[in-house]
Amino acid sequence: MLYDFCDGWLFHDGDIQTLPPEMKGPVYMQTKTECRMRGPASLHYCDAPDDYGVTDTRALHRELTHERWERVTLPHDYMINAELPKTGNPARGYAVPHAAWYRKHFTPTTVQGKHTERIFDGVTKDCEVYLNGVLLARHHTAYTPFSVDLSDVIRPGEENVLAVRVDNAEPEGWWY
């Protein structure tokens, strides 16, 4: 079944320091697996636009955060509002390159035991895709679609958070 995932995203313009992953148990220390991230990639990160500035997140059961998040619909181009100093690179429309974060909260109901993937039509430029704090994919070009398998990490019937960190620090054509 296909779902439209364009609505209901949260966006933060700028990079956010990601905390190191929680420590793995001694049995798994030698494995090459990722462990759950903290910070904006995690399931329990406080990104609600209405909760901006909340200093006591115990009632929210979420990590404390001071970043402002806004609601957006995809496709979304955060560089269109970027700072445009005349000393910038004209190939980028003079925009200053920087990273940003997108997050999507969703509760799947019909995925139990099924292969589940999310298809991205394109993300400019480098990106990392997380589900519930687990790094699932990296993609390094703006002009190609890619898919991410969510099957092993998705939680049917529970809230899930898909987080995407986008970084356009490397040169990439920006033509408006």
Segments predicted by a language model, with ranges:
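Accessory beta-strand-rich segments of carbohydrate-active enzymes
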Residues: 3, 12-16, 34, 77, ...
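Accessory carbohydrate-binding/adhesion or oligomerization-edge regions at the termini
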Residues: 1-84, 163-174
